[in-house]
């Protein structure tokens, strides 16, 4: 899959061995960014990245933060024992991006149960049943930024992951589950807009759409 650095040009020692890894967040962003390239080697790296990550899910559905290239060992936290919530969010979105572009339904069927596990793991982070994820302190793989609870970055990705998973369920012909997931995505979207851009206007006077995102 996509590695964190050029394996031929970088000699790593100590904790830098992490760079000899497939990273979930970085690899999945690379999939999304390169999906329109008509290149067999890149397409192979996209598929290999997804397989590498989904073959090494934790039993509870957690996506590894990275997988070592030398021995295939998954790491779910990294140096310092931190978590990586955004890795799972990007992984679901990247999987849909790949299947939508390639039409690889065999890959989708092979990992359908594992995708469900990832979504269940993510859903468990909604600890108060308010549709949004409650992110632990420094819970994203973004240089340990000291932020927590409802984070716009994560919530928008959560919305996107639900849309992506709903579309994958449609491809699996699980139409009832797909409809439920897509309806939930719109409820998440409305919750994000209401919480992050609140208004003091009475609800009856407020415009139907003050802000929007795709």
What spans do the regions from the language model cover?
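A short small-residue
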Residues: 29, 141-145, 164-167
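A generic signature of intrinsically disordered, low-complexity regions enriched in glycine/proline
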Residues: 13, 30, 74, 90, ...
């Amino acid at each position: 899959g996509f590695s964190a650095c050029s394996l031929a040009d970088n000699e790593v020692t100590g904790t830098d061995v992490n760079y000899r890894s497939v990273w979930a967040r970085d690899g999945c962003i690379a999939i999304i960014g390169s999906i329109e390239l008509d290149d067999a080697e890149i397409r192979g790296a996209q598929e290999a990245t997804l397989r590498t990550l989904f073959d090494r899910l934790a039993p509870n559905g957690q996506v590894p933060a990275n997988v070592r290239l030398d021995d295939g060992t998954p790491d779910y936290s990294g140096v310092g024992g931190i978590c990586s919530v955004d890795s799972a969010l990007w992984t679901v979105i990247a999987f849909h991006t790949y299947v939508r572009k390639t039409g690889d339904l065999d890959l989708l069927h092979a990992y359908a149960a594992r995708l469900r596990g990832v979504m269940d793991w993510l859903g468990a982070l909604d600890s108060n049943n308010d549709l949004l994820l409650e992110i632990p302190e420094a819970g994203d793989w973004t240089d340990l930024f000291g932020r927590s609870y409802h984070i716009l970055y994560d919530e928008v990705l959560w919305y996107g992951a639900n849309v992506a998973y709903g579309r994958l369920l449609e491809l699996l012909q699980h139409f009832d589950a797909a409809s439920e997931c897509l309806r939930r995505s719109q409820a998440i979207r409305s919750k994000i807009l209401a919480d992050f851009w609140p208004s003091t206007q009475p609800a009856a006077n407020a415009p139907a759409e003050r802000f929007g995102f795709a």
